[in-house]
Amino acid sequence: MNPILKKLQFKGQSPVLVLAAPAEFKETKAALEVPVHVAAKGRYGFVLGFAKSRAEAVAHAKVAKKALADQRSVFWIAYPKGSSKKYQADLNRDSLHALLEQHGFDGVSLVALDEDWSALRFKQVET
């Protein structure tokens, strides 16, 4: 299995929603081997959004809130590391966690995807 997909706990959920993926993740998207959507068209067990700004993160959270199939669905936001030489962002782990908490999500797991990207997994908070 692709090492990034393994880190993201991908277990064959289908279809998958991937939002705003940078070009260097083309190979990872191809490794999914399931239908991959880049715009929400239903319900998903696995959603991955790439955000370089707070506004992008909030937009992805709003899409995910409607698109996640159920409480077991996996939702990740990938964001540039502070040490990235390629990307600039106004996000980090703590600010992303606090921001999405306001939209009904709780950050539960953090992984490093590569030298430029980290990802934080969120679960919907039951209301």
Model-derived regions: residue spans:
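Conserved Class I S-adenosyl-L-methionine
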Residues: 90-111
